[in-house]
């Protein structure tokens, strides 16, 4: 029996590189956003708010990252399961209402393990997802 295990987590350096990539893409599509990164335990590692981004997007982006990390899937993937009558209806009311049920949060996976997650808020759901995917593309190139 092992009494401990090593846990990989995303680094601040990687989070900063992803933030740069997201900011560049957000400027390109003219959408000011808040970009958040959490570590493997869902704890805040980085939050970056672009000029003119909605203040409310700070909590939303962080909670998207938290959700993607803790549920080990994109936030857009749980939308159907939380609708009235579905198996996870009401899930968004748990965890001190930190669970976000629309797109913009994605887990960061390395060697089959979630090592953190990203969250983007400020644009449409489609724009937020695009920018979250931009972050993952950047991470895969590091």
Swiss-Prot record:
SUPFAM superfamilies: GlcG-like. It holds the Pfam family HbpS-like. It comes from the Bacteria. Belongs to the GlcG family. This is Uncharacterized 15.0 kDa protein in dhaT-dhaS intergenic region. The lineage of its organism: Bacteria, Pseudomonadati, Pseudomonadota, Gammaproteobacteria, Enterobacterales.
């Amino acid at each position: 029996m092992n009494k401990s295990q090593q846990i990989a987590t995303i680094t601040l350096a990687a989070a900063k590189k992803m933030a740069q990539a997201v900011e560049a893409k957000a400027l390109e599509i003219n959408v000011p956003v808040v970009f958040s990164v959490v570590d493997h335990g869902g704890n805040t590692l980085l939050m970056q708010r672009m000029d003119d981004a909605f203040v409310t997007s700070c909590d939303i982006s962080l909670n998207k990252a938290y959700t993607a990390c803790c549920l080990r899937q994109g936030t857009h993937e749980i939308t159907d399961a939380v609708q009235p009558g579905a198996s996870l209806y009401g899930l968004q009311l748990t965890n001190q209402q930190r669970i976000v049920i629309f797109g913009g949060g994605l887990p960061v996976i390395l060697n089959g393990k979630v090592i953190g997650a990203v969250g983007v808020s400020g644009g449409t759901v489609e724009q937020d997802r695009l920018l979250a995917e931009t972050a993952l593309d950047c991470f895969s190139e590091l």
